[in-house]
């Protein structure tokens, strides 16, 4: 809220929309593989940062490798060579991946932050199926868990 105060604005004047990339599946390794190309694209953009959040300092070598290997033409390609550049730990730090319970728990914790809404980025491959699963299973599970 420091930026709001410095600008003389109230929190109610700003909409905070958290964009979430997520892969839900019973096979955790497959879910992580599903988010890896997107995570690599993020790592490539972090490479030039001079100041890094302390929790991400350990990923600097991955950011450098991603910057060298990432090609926009293969941005979310499931076959992109750059998808293997980043570690599982980094991929999990920028996206949600795992079974339904894991993703629902993380979404509920994110919703507790001072945000107004969550927008879900749809990954490549089977987007209609992903959207149907999100709207028919994931969101209702988050809503049901919120009532408990």
Model regions: which residues?
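C-terminal helical cap(s) of enzyme catalytic domains, especially alpha/beta-barrels
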Residues: 1, 127-147
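Short secondary-structure boundary segments
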Residues: 122
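Glycine-/small-residue-rich active-site loops that bind phosphorylated ligands and cofactors
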Residues: 23, 125-126
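An alpha-helical appendage that flanks or caps ligand/catalytic pockets
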Residues: 1-109, 143-147
């Amino acid at each position: 809220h420091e930026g709001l105060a410095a600008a003389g604005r109230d929190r109610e004047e700003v909409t905070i929309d958290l964009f979430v990339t997520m892969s839900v599946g019973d096979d955790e390794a497959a879910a992580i593989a599903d988010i890896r190309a997107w995570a690599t694209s993020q790592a490539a953009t972090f490479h030039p940062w001079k100041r890094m959040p302390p929790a991400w300092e350990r990923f600097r070598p991955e950011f450098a490798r991603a910057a060298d290997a990432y090609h926009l033409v293969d941005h979310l390609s499931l076959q992109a060579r750059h998808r293997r550049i980043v570690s599982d730990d980094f991929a999990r730090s920028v996206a949600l991946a795992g079974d339904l319970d894991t993703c629902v728990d993380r979404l509920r914790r994110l919703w507790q932050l001072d945000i107004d809404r969550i927008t879900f980025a749809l990954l490549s491959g089977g987007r209609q199926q992903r959207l149907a699963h999100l709207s028919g299973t994931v969101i209702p599970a988050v809503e049901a868990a919120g009532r408990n």
